[in-house]
Amino acid sequence: MRGQSKGKQTSKKTAPSKSSNGQGLAMVIDSKVNKRDEGIFYLLPSEMSKSGLLNPEKFDSCDIRNVEVDDIRPSALLGILSSLKPNGTVSVLICEPIAVMQPYEARMIEANAKLAGFTDIKTSPATFFNEFSNQEDETLCVTFTKPEKPLF
């Protein structure tokens, strides 16, 4: 199972704070979350391809975490692209405990985001809490933005 270890992992990274106070709506795709918050729409990774069925340009941001990198395909990202407002951002936290694999997986996400039509693709260092080892692990976070005008 690439992209996740056998142990439980959770992320301390949260959805944008502007969504929790009612100013916008955020989408969170997470395999470890089963709660409801006002202003946040949760999806399981298995439902990621259905994001294209949601109202177009509804969400301000999307936060993806605890998802296998192989599930973050261009077709799934295209659905997310259509449901985001212009200049909406997507943040993908790579929860891979094997540090050597993180740059490879980040490049794979970057390529898939570019194929889906996103711009301003950036990778930066981040941390996540690995419940299996009970410690903070260093990882990478890939962010990208929906352009104001479609690329194609």
Residue ranges of each PLM-predicted region?
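Hydrophobic adenine-recognition pocket in adenosine-nucleotide-binding enzymes
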Residues: 67
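Conserved S-adenosyl-L-methionine
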Residues: 118-130
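Intrinsically disordered, Lys/Arg-rich low-complexity segments
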Residues: 2-15
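A short glycine-rich, Lys/Arg-flanked "PGG" loop and its adjoining helix->strand segment in the class I
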Residues: 73-89
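A short acidic, Gly/Pro-enriched loop at the edge of an enzyme's catalytic core
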Residues: 48-64
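Core SAM-dependent methyltransferase catalytic element
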Residues: 128-152
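Class I SAM-dependent methyltransferase SAM/SAH-binding core
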Residues: 13-53
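Conserved class I S-adenosyl-L-methionine
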Residues: 91-115, 136
